[in-house]
């Protein structure tokens, strides 16, 4: 294998630190430019032989040029760099720069970025530039066009909410408060986006312009700082794919190679609006280290070095990332959160090696993976309640508590539906089987004939909400199981319900006689027990613990029958029959 090219990184923070891990595994020499000899990134990887990690500001022209002279490729872990120097370095042939300095410069100015994307047909919220030294009349005029409230944004040097200020009215007090918060920076205004979720997609782009996206994630912020990511994005059917397509479209219009973090808003009507792009690894992609076949950090290096891009697929059905934020100047809270995470199955701790803690500073993160959303939910609650600023109400919104008995689980794997409440006595045994196996489920009523729109919506959103199987009970015409099967990709198990006439045979025939291409499993009349057991066997193909539990259940049935055989032989059948009559 030919020696790898040497990569220089501008910035030695936590993103650079996490780039060093795959670099070491792939034998990629790295040189890291930042002030100090013990930055997070410099702690974890030695420089190539006869070199040392340069010590100096990553915005300094002399230091950038010195780094460029020792490297084959320069890249960034932060976009607030000197794009002019990077452009000059590349033009002079000192070294290659990825992503393109042109792209970095564009992204540095959020107004220019938004204007460019809008011109390329990428969906964004309405926005307008504010003049230099805007007057109150300027604010009133723009509010008249964009409406109130609106978001005032700094064009440059804005991250973690530090460049955003909501303007709720055009009163002098509100205007001056926003101007004071944003400081003496050029501004633009953006129409208010009353989103239902904030979404992010990581996209990797190689030098040939090929783009691949990771599954979209839901990003949950508190006080404008990212706190939790949930992967994959759950919601209406197709929303994950639409988010990926929007992100790929946006990154496809940029120049250069590397990983890009694309943030967007999911609106109440299902529309997706792009918010902004980061030309580097992103906090919303940290889960990819444990949760995906190739991490965002490895794929960034692969892309800029023209190595084959790695698969972006998830390794696990469910994953989350929790940021570890400083609570004070001491490390006590950080250590407590990390130690607590070590007790949580599927959790991996990443501490960034920062020497000083301060309130709201990103000191590390925890990735947690699970076989299901419900399992992830419980693990996530343990992690969130260990945070020093834990608030039960906020945590319950992100990771709802387990339900009371005989109530639907907030993160179900199996859906139980029926056409009428009169079917409940028949479907009730299925709930007991699922509870016995510890399978989270939901139960509701939806009729193929009386509530067809509700039925269609349920079927179309089931997979996107994390369900993996549906048990549908119906009597008479019994169209519910088949109709649901025609609207979802999930396995549907029909339970024929015995009605007042025909003893349920009509229901059985209706469910079992589905046309080719629309499979619908069918169990015996009124036998929701077998429907639940079949659903568990389906889940067991991907959840080993359920497969083992099914084997134990079958073994218990065998032992029960063998015990009866022994009693029958010991007592004789006459006494056995008499005991059965009792």
From Swiss-Prot:
Pfam families: AIRC, ATP-grasp, PurK_C, RS_preATP-grasp-like. It is an enzyme of class 4 (lyase). Residues 114-305 form the ATP-grasp domain. InterPro entries: Ade2_fungi/plant, ATP-grasp, ATP-grasp_carboxylate-amine, ATP_grasp_subdomain_1, PreATP-grasp_dom_sf, PurE_ClassI, PurE_dom, PurK. Its EC number is 4.1.1.21. It comes from the Eukaryota. One of its GO terms (molecular function) is metal ion binding. GO terms for biological process: 'de novo' IMP biosynthetic process. Keywords: ATP-binding, Decarboxylase, Lyase, Nucleotide-binding, Purine biosynthesis. SUPFAM superfamilies: Glutathione synthetase ATP-binding domain-like (SSF56059), N5-CAIR mutase (phosphoribosylaminoimidazole carboxylase, PurE) (SSF52255), PreATP-grasp domain (SSF52440), Rudiment single hybrid motif (SSF51246). SMART domains: AIRC. Pathway: Purine metabolism; IMP biosynthesis via de novo pathway; 5-amino-1-(5-phospho-D-ribosyl)imidazole-4-carboxylate from 5-amino-1-(5-phospho-D-ribosyl)imidazole (carboxylase route): step 1/1. It catalyses: 5-amino-1-(5-phospho-D-ribosyl)imidazole-4-carboxylate + H(+) = 5-amino-1-(5-phospho-beta-D-ribosyl)imidazole + CO2. ATP binds at residues 143-200. The keyword Nucleotide-binding applies. In the C-terminal section; belongs to the AIR carboxylase family. Class I subfamily. This is Phosphoribosylaminoimidazole carboxylase. The lineage of its organism: Eukaryota, Fungi, Dikarya, Basidiomycota, Agaricomycotina. The gene is ADE2.
């Amino acid at each position: 294998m030919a020696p790898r090219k040497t990569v220089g990184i501008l910035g030695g923070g936590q993103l650079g630190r996490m780039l060093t891990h795959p670099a070491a595994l792939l034998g990629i020499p790295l040189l890291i430019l930042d002030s100090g000899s013990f930055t997070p990134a410099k702690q974890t990887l030695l420089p190539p032989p006869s070199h040392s990690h340069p010590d100096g500001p990553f915005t300094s022209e002399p230091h950038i040029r010195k780094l460029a002279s020792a490297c084959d490729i320069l890249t960034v872990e932060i976009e607030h760099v000197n794009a002019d120097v990077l452009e000059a370095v590349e033009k002079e042939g000192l070294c290659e720069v990825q992503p393109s300095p042109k792209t970095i410069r564009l992204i540095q100015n959020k107004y220019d970025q938004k204007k460019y994307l809008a011109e390329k047909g990428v969906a964004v919220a309405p926005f307008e530039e504010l003049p230099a030294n805007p007057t109150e009349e300027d604010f009133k005029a723009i509010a008249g066009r964009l409406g109130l409230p609106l978001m005032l944004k700094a064009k440059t040097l804005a991250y973690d909410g530090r460049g955003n200020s909501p303007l709720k009215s055009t009163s002098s007090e509100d205007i001056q408060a926003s101007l004071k918060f944003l400081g003496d920076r050029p501004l633009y205004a953006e129409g208010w986006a009353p989103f239902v979720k904030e979404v992010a997609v990581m996209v990797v782009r190689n030098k040939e312009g090929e783009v691949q996206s990771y599954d979209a994630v839901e990003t949950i912020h508190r006080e404008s700082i990212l706190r939790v990511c949930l992967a994959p994005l759950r919601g209406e059917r197709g929303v994950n794919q639409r988010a990926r397509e929007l992100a790929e479209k946006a990154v496809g219009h940029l120049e250069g190679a590397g990983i890009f973090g694309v943030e967007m808003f999911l609106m109440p009507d299902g529309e997706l609006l792009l918010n902004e792009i980061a030309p580097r690894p992103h906090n919303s992609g940290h889960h990819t280290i444990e949760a995906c076949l190739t991490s965002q950090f490895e794929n960034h290096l692969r892309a800029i070095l023209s190595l084959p891009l790695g698969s972006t697929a998830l390794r696990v059905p469910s994953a989350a990332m929790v940021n570890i934020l400083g609570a004070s100047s001491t490390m006590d809270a950080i250590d407590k959160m990390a130690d607590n995470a070590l007790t949580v199955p599927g959790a991996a701790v990443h501490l960034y090696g920062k020497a000083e803690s301060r309130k709201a500073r990103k000191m590390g993160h925890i990735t947690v993976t699970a076989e299901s959303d419900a399992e992830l939910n419980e693990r996530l609650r343990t992690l969130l309640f260990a945070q020093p600023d834990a608030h039960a109400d906020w945590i319950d919104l992100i990771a709802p508590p387990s339900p009371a008995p005989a109530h639907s689980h907030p993160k179900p794997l199996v859906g139980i539906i029926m056409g009428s409440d009169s079917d409940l006595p028949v479907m009730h045994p299925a709930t007991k089987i699922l509870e016995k196996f510890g399978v989270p489920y939901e139960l509701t009523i939806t009729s193929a004939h009386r509530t067809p729109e509700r039925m269609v919506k349920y079927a179309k959103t089931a997979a996107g909400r994390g369900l993996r199987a549906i048990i549908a009970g119906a009597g008479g015409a019994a169209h519910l199981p088949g109709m649901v099967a025609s609207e979802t990709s999930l396995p549907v198990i029909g339970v024929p319900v015995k009605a007042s006439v025909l003893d349920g045979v009509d229901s059985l025939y209706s469910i079992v006689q589905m046309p080719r291409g629309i499979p619908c499993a069918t169990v015996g009349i009124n036998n929701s027990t077998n429907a639940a057991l079949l659903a568990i066997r389906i889940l067991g193909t991907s959840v080993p613990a359920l497969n083992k539990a099914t084997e134990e259940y079958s073994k218990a049935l065998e032992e029960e029958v063998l015990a009866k055989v022994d009693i029958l032989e010991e007592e004789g059948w006459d006494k056995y029959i008499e005991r059965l009559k009792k």
